[in-house]
A protein has these predicted regions:
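Surface-exposed, active-site-proximal loop segments in enzymatic domains
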Residues: 45-49, 80-94, 118-136, 163-176, ...
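Extended hydrophobic secondary-structure segments that form protein cores and membrane-embedded regions
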Residues: 158, 205-210, 243-249
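Substrate-binding cleft and catalytic face of glycoside hydrolase catalytic domains
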Residues: 103-127, 157-168, 202, 212-213, ...
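Conserved beta-strand positions in the central sheet of alpha/beta enzyme cores
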Residues: 72-75, 112, 158, 275, ...
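Basic- and aromatic-lined ligand-binding clefts that recognize polyanionic substrates
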Residues: 198-231
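Glycine-rich, aromatic-flanked loop segments that form ligand/cofactor-binding clefts
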Residues: 19-41, 64-69, 78, 83-86, ...
């Protein structure tokens, strides 16, 4: 093949993209509670070791593109759209008004707001630092985000304590820091109660998002399980208002099974929001789009969620690759991410109804015939052949993932 001129590259990518097929319409995509974050659509490709590869994108452009794709919901950090110096000013009110108008004009809803408490230099020691002035500022930021959330009609507020911890052990007294962090959440919840009453709206669902490491060396609430313990610790004045926003990749980063972490959140009644992406176990936070690394694991995750009635939100918290152009972000990256999720979601529905999996599962639950429930050898023998069904269920899920259950085969 000859080198492709720059003027012909978009048409080539577009032609090959259409040739892939399997796409859903914007109307079909809107049926799912999928949310598009401002930070993902506007990500320029920058990282600790990387310069940006894309041009800046405004929130107006991101929202318009999401509408065209069929992503029905939008989410943002406060400073994704409002410069830190303009917070708490009339400029903030003007920007929030523009956002509201843009969402309305494009038929989108704001589903979630979150506060940046990790990037600005004021948070160099974290949002629960020793200085009462830093903690007061952090609390004001959280309360301000709650206010913005109600102004935009959001349902959720997310908290990511990525800078809550320490670089140097011994410099921070952990139990005190946990109490200070709880004070910030308590301030946000109290403000929410008051602001919701003013707007005649329900209070927001406040969702904590865990991450085992990065950017802080040691994060004090590194896992979803740690956050469940924190919520139940007695430090929160309104624990009923606080739940979880697990992120798929954050669970993989510390070697966990995301499905098991989600199961524990479901059991606690605290799975309220879910950040979806993909990546590699025990690696850093690469934020690859859903289904590109672990599609079988994702199928199993969605089987669990569908089985327990969790239907969203599903927040596309990923970074379009640095190799993808500004055009490609919205022409290829986001549409294909949404379509992979929908396909996996519908596959999960098929798996739940699959007669082979259902009969195998029922048989395992029924167990074998045992005459003496205290005879360990008899119990072992009674289930010896039946337990082979575990592997067969795994094989059947593989067949569903590849469409083999519908008769697809390969000629060899």
């Amino acid at each position: 093949m000859k080198p492709i001129p720059a003027s012909e590259q978009i048409s080539l990518v577009d032609r090959l993209s259409k040739a892939c097929g399997g796409t859903y319409t914007a109307e079909q995509r809107r049926k799912y509670f999928i949310t598009g974050p401002q930070w993902a659509g506007a990500y320029e490709g920058q990282a600790l070791f990387h310069a940006p590869t894309r041009k800046p994108v405004t929130f107006e452009e991101v929202i318009r593109h999401y509408a065209e794709i069929g992503i029905g919901y939008w989410a943002t950090h406060d400073t994704d759209v409002i410069p830190a110096g303009d917070l708490f000013t009339s400029k903030q009110d003007e920007i929030v008004g523009r956002i509201g108008d843009t969402l309305k004009a494009n038929g989108l809803a704001c589903s979630m707001v979150t506060t940046e408490t990790f990037y600005h230099a004021v948070f160099s020691a974290g949002p629960a630092a020793e200085s009462p002035y830093v903690r007061q500022y952090a609390a004001e930021r959280l309360k301000n985000t709650v206010k913005i959330g109600h102004q935009l009609g959001a349902q959720f507020a997310v908290y990511w304590p990525g800078s809550f911890g320490y670089q140097i052990q011994g410099a921070v007294e952990e139990t005190q820091a946990l109490r200070w962090y709880a004070d910030g959440l308590n301030a946000a919840c109290e403000a929410d109660i008051a602001i919701a009453a003013q707007h005649n709206r329900p209070t927001l669902k406040h969702c904590m998002e865990a991450k085992p490491f990065e950017p802080q060396a040691e994060i004090l609430l590194p896992t979803s399980d740690a956050m469940l313990s924190f919520i139940a610790s007695g430090l929160l004045t309104h624990p009923e208002m606080v739940g979880l926003n697990p992120e798929y990749l954050h669970e993989l980063m510390w070697g966990a099974a995301p499905r098991a972490a989600l199961a524990r959140a479901l059991t606690a009644g605290k799975l309220w929001h879910f950040d979806i992406n993909d990546g590699y176990r025990l690696k850093h936070d690469v934020d690859i789009a859903v289904g590109l690394v672990n599609p079988l694991d994702w199928l199993n995750v969605l089987i669990l969620l569908r089985s327990h009635g969790y239907n969203g939100p599903f927040n596309l918290d990923y970074k379009p690759p640095r190799t993808t152009s500004n055009w490609g972000v919205f022409a290829v990256s986001f549409p294909t991410a949404v379509d992979r999720f929908i396909s996996l979601w519908e596959m999960a529905g098929e798996a739940i109804e699959d007669p082979i999996i259902r009969e195998a599962t029922d048989a395992l639950k029924a167990g074998g015939v045992v005459s003496d429930p205290r005879d360990v050898n008899a119990i072992t023998e009674a289930h010896k052949e039946l337990l082979t069904l575990h592997e067969l269920i795994g094989h059947r899920l593989f067949q569903i993932l590849l469409g083999l259950h519908r008769g697809r085969t390969y000629s060899v």
